[in-house]
UniProtKB/Swiss-Prot annotation:
Mg(2+) binds at residues 209, 261. The active site is at 106 (o-(5'-phospho-dna)-tyrosine intermediate). Residues 12-162 form the Topo IIA-type catalytic domain. GO terms for molecular function: ATP binding; DNA binding; DNA topoisomerase type II (double strand cut, ATP-hydrolyzing) activity; magnesium ion binding. Relaxes both positive and negative supercoils and exhibits a strong decatenase and unknotting activity; it cannot introduce DNA supercoils. ATP is absolutely required for DNA cleavage; the nonhydrolyzable analog AMP-PNP generates nicked or linear products from a supercoiled dsDNA substrate. Generates staggered two-nucleotide long 5' overhangs. The enzyme is covalently attached transiently to the 5'-ends of the cleaved strands. It comes from Saccharolobus shibatae (strain ATCC 51178 / DSM 5389 / JCM 8931 / NBRC 15437 / B12) (Sulfolobus shibatae). Homodimer. Heterotetramer of two Top6A and two Top6B chains. HAMAP family: Top6A. This is Type 2 DNA topoisomerase 6 subunit A. NCBIfam families: PRK04342.1-5 (NF003336). Its EC number is 5.6.2.2. Keywords: ATP-binding, DNA-binding, Isomerase, Magnesium, Metal-binding, Nucleotide-binding, Topoisomerase.
């Protein structure tokens, strides 16, 4: 690849990641020189090692570590896989390449032949890895071991989130105006830290779970009317979207509101944005947005409560409500026991759901009319601070 087309930001990111990766694994060489056994200490990525920091409102990785010993027959293969993958990633960095996680799987996949002591007979044959989930897990191990996100190592993944609004950014060598995307939107790139924010004219960020609702709000001109940055995660958010939202909040000081379906899966999407996820707790400090607010759709929006009237009439509730399934009930009961859902407001929300056994999609609010959703429901809830923090 010709380096003349690579931006300075990109080159600096490569240099930094390559240096950290090299130095971390050179420590293994030093162990060998000293005659010490080859050992890697990697923080454990388990639920038991995920700790909720109440003060910082973040789900963080605990201090438990696993020791990966090359001389341990149970760990030798995983040790080999980790070193192999690190070598492939390092080569890609210094060669100005942009591998995907699928590329890395294929680049490292080959057979290892174990020969007899005499060297004239193959005793056994084993693949470096058989399935991509193996190599993906190794990449995560390297992230935890080096404290480098895969995005920082210029490893690409499929773009998922989209954004539109009065914001100009620099990506690579180009300046992109996110207010001039027509009926479309800017796809949030898998390396959001390489984006520079040039200027912004917005008062808040609205993240919408559903892509279809995002498109409706975009075409209705919601972000123009209310000077906002409109984003969709298109379901469960990917890492790039979470990091982009975090940067908008942290660097541009824009409040963040999350709009999801009124069900346990929508609540969890909100919590992933706000405090992080259990599986990626090692990344929460860079991906989560502790200041994010749950705008809705809430049980109070559907049924009302002592503080507010419902947005839906009895007839509308009858038409729009979806009966919760057993899986929904089970998920709600699980979420209810998570430390970060034990606030008074969230316990009330979850208990109402369990009592009513009812859920609602965002589209139901749009069924009352797009103007209702865009120009009454959302702005009214923001103005009245009708959200769960």
């Amino acid at each position: 690849m010709s380096s003349e087309f690579i931006s300075k930001v990109d080159k600096e990111a490569r240099r930094k990641a390559a240096n950290i990766l090299r130095d971390k694994f050179l420590n293994l060489v030093e162990q060998l020189k000293k005659g010490e056994p080859l050992v890697m200490e990697i923080p454990m990525r388990t639920l038991s090692n995920a700790i909720y920091d109440e003060k910082r409102k973040l789900l963080l990785l605990g201090e438990k570590k696993l020791r990966r010993n090359f001389l341990d027959l149970n760990e030798a293969k995983r040790f080999m896989q980790t070193v192999l993958m690190a070598s492939i990633i390092y080569d890609a960095l210094v060669s100005d390449e942009y591998p995907t996680i699928r590329d890395l799987y294929y680049r490292g996949k080959h057979s290892l032949l174990l020969k007899s002591i005499e060297g004239n007979k193959i005793v056994s044959e084993e693949n470096t890895w058989d399935e991509q989930k193996e190599s993906d897990s190794v990449i995560v191990d390297i992230e935890v071991f080096t404290s480098l996100l895969r995005e920082e190592m210029l490893i690409l993944s499929k773009e998922k989130g989209k954004v539109v609004g009065n914001l100009r950014i620099r990506s690579g060598n180009d300046v992109i105006d996110l207010s001039k995307t027509g009926h479309g939107a800017y796809a949030i790139e898998p390396t959001p830290d390489l984006i520079d924010f040039i200027d912004v004219d917005a008062e808040f960020v609205l993240v919408v779970e559903k892509d279809a609702v995002f498109q409706q709000l975009h075409r209705a001109g919601f972000w123009k009317q209310y000077k906002s940055i409109l984003i969709t995660s298109a379901g469960q958010p990917d890492r790039a979207t979470r990091r982009f939202v975090r940067r908008l909040n942290e660097e541009l000081k824009l409040p963040v509101y999350i709009l999801t379906d009124a069900d346990p899966y929508g609540w969890y999407i909100f919590s992933v944005f706000r405090i992080g996820s259990i599986s990626l707790s090692y990344e929460s400090e860079r991906l989560a947005t502790p200041d994010a607010k749950f705008l809705g759709v809430s049980m109070g929006d559907i049924f009302g409560n002592s503080r507010k009237k419902p947005y839906l009439s009895e007839a509308e509730r009858k038409n729009y409500i979806i009966k919760a399934k057993d899986a929904d009930i089970k998920r709600a009961e699980e979420i209810k026991n998570y430390e970060w859902f034990k606030t008074k407001a969230w316990q009330e929300e979850i208990n109402t759901f369990l009592q009513r056994k009812a859920k609602l999609e965002i589209e139901a609010m749009a069924s009352k009319g797009l103007k209702f959703l865009a120009f009454q429901y959302i702005p009214e809830k923001i103005t009245n601070k009708d959200y769960i923090a």
